[in-house]
Amino acid sequence: MKKTLTTIRRSSIARRLIISFLLILIVPITALSVSAYQSAVASLDVQMTQSAKENVQILDHIIDDKISTTEKSLAYFSDWATAEKFQDKKKTELKQEFKQFIQMNDNVAAVFSSGKDGDFTRYPYADMPSDFNALERDWYKEAMANKGKTIVTEPYESISSGKMVVTIARQTVDGSGVVAIDMKIDDLVTTAKGINIGKEGYAFILSQNKKVIAYSGEKAGTELKGDWVDKLYKDKSGDFEYTYKGKKKKMAFATSQTTGWKISGTMYANEIHDAASRVLIMASIVLAIAIGAGMTAIYFVIRSITKPLRRIVASAEKISEGDLTETIEINSKDELGVLSESFNHMAHSLRSLIHGIKDSVEHVASSSEELTASADQTSRATEHITMAIEQFSNGSESQSEKIETTTEQINEMNDGLAELARAAAVITETSADSTEVSSKGETLVQKTAGQMNTIDHSVKAAEQVVKGLEIKSKDITNILRVINGIADQTNLLALNAAIEAARAGEYGRGFSVVAEEVRKLAVQSADSAKEIESLISEIVKEIHTSLNVLQSVNKEVETGLVMTDETKQSFKHISQMTNQIASELQNMNATVEELSAGAQEISAASNDITAISKESSDGIQDIAASAEEQLASMEEISSSALTLERMSEELRDLTKQFKVDK
């Protein structure tokens, strides 16, 4: 971005004007086009979503109307069909009512009923499978479980017709049976498929358990799965976006209050963008026309600016070559005309300036020659004085530096001795502390050894106890096996007794009951014995594990005893070495203190000598510095005079390049 801006700044005014005008044209129109496109997308999204919701509501009303009408008829049948109507002599009347109802309702596939005894009546008649039992059907069970309520089943394939239906059922008022109606869902499928949302969008209906009632490309009764299905059943109504087979889609849905079915409308998201793309195409056409018209206007505007600028540039080039007699012809009173007039004034001012510079150069050249000669004489005299002072100063400085070096070395030695004394004192104290800590460590190691011996005895005792538990657990297992054998034998005897009692007939019935109870108790005893045996087996396993752990602990304790003894011997050796070090340190402290006292006396004498030497050296250096400053000043004056003379010559040559008179 920075490189692009630099390139634009370095380009011509015409190019910058073209870029500026194009930006003024393109940016607003492009922004408007994008805004219009986004507004169109948002508006179409709202419209299509609203259309989907309206279609869902229409389909919901259709379902509610069909179900409500059927429920009202079913309520009539449940009030009318009492237990008396289920009897054989009344079945003809029941079938006649069913027949009339079917003739009046095309969407009904069958009407049927069943009493509590399973007596099934249906119109129209159909051959039912030999194992058919109405009492085992879902519609019968749900209706009997929801007394006074109408239930709607999941879509299923009718046994008689082989077509997909939903059953609407209700228990009779007197509770003697159930009356049900098989409603065709073909017309619902047709209605749902006839609803179009956008170009490729469609509506569909799912049951409460995610099974298809009406869905394009899916068979009724098929259970649907997927993340979008879970979202659909998360709320009662709403809309959401999802991806289906790699394409983005949008869905609006609602839940039927009557049946609990999910009624949904779905559409492809790209339809919205396809419809809105027309707006983008029109905006692009407008942008192209605007750029064409704008470029034509820009050409004439730029030409009116660049032509006068070229004349000014040509005149400026002549002036840059030294021709100050050049003037610009003024043809306008705009900003370019004002610039041309200012340019002419500038050329006139430059001519006057060059005349004045030529006169001043001659005067400066003669003055600089006189100043150079005077500065040379003064500089030579100052150099002689400076050389004499420097020789004396160098000797004094050398002496002072040697004294300072000696003093610093003595001070450093003194500081080192003091530090050595402090370190020796600290080491002595540390040695004493080490001796005390070593004694305490030896005592603690002895206590630890005693504790480790106690732990060793405890572990060995625990190992013996665990081994005893293992033996007793095996004895319990043997006893349980004996009990289990007794229970099996008792069970066999009880069975034999029951057989003998059965042979005895009526007289042996009481004994048979007792034998059965004895057999049950034997079975329970055997089961309990097996459970106890299983628990004992687990306990034996745990005992084995504990025994292994105790043996491992015993080995670790023995190892710990050996290491404790080694640690005790190490502490004794440390204590002996510490006492020896403390004795040697006390002797060293006395020697260091004597050296430190002597070094302090030498350091004090060196400091006095250094102070006197510095005072003498400082005075000589001040004189030398003043002389050097004067010499430097004279050299600068001489150099400046030479420079001024050279510059006046150069300035004289430069003014000769300008043409100030025609």
From Swiss-Prot:
It is found in: Cell membrane. Residues 38-281 are extracellular. GO terms for biological process: chemotaxis; signal transduction. Coiled coil: none annotated. InterPro entries: dCache_1, HAMP_dom, MCPsignal_dom, Sensor-like_sf, Tar_rcpt_lig-bd. Residues 152-228 form the Cache domain. The chain crosses the membrane at residues 17-37, 282-302. GO terms for cellular component: plasma membrane. Interacts with YabA. This is Methyl-accepting chemotaxis protein TlpA. It comes from Bacillus subtilis (strain 168).
